[in-house]
Amino acid sequence: MALTKAEMSEHLFEKLGLSKRDAKDLVELFFEEVRRALENGEQVKLSGFGNFDLRDKNQRPGRNPKTGEDIPITARRVVTFRPGQKLKSRVENASPKGE
């Protein structure tokens, strides 16, 4: 199961005593700041969590898997995420669900 923005808002409501509306606004504001920074070409560094980076990918040759036809894959900018060491360690040491 995936963690959703609604669940994050609910956790803030329960743990910090924020109103549901304020909790939802806080989550939305956080993600809007991350989006804005990336749109402006900035790296997003979240200490203890990881980094969101932008990478420019060049045009490259590709192939349509249905027809086998050669097609160019256009140049584009992509977002990458690199987890920080603390996050990696916590994930590696966590027990899988169901155990």
Swiss-Prot record:
GO biological process, one term: regulation of DNA-templated transcription
Chain's role: This protein is one of the two subunits of integration host factor, a specific DNA-binding protein that functions in genetic recombination as well as in transcriptional and translational control.
Region (Disordered): 49-73
GO MF, any single term: structural constituent of chromatin
Subunit structure: Heterodimer of an alpha and a beta chain.
Keywords, alphabetical: DNA recombination, DNA-binding, Transcription, Transcription regulation, Translation regulation
Entry-linked Gene3D superfamilies: IHF-like DNA-binding proteins
Name of this protein: Integration host factor subunit alpha
Recorded family membership: Belongs to the bacterial histone-like protein family.
Organism: Serratia marcescens
SUPFAM superfamilies given in the database record: IHF-like DNA-binding proteins
CC terms in the record's Gene Ontology section: cytosol
NCBIfam families noted in UniProt: himA (TIGR00987), PRK00285.1 (NF001401)
Native organism taxonomy: Bacteria, Pseudomonadati, Pseudomonadota, Gammaproteobacteria, Enterobacterales
Signal peptide interval: none
Superkingdom, taxonomy of origin: Bacteria
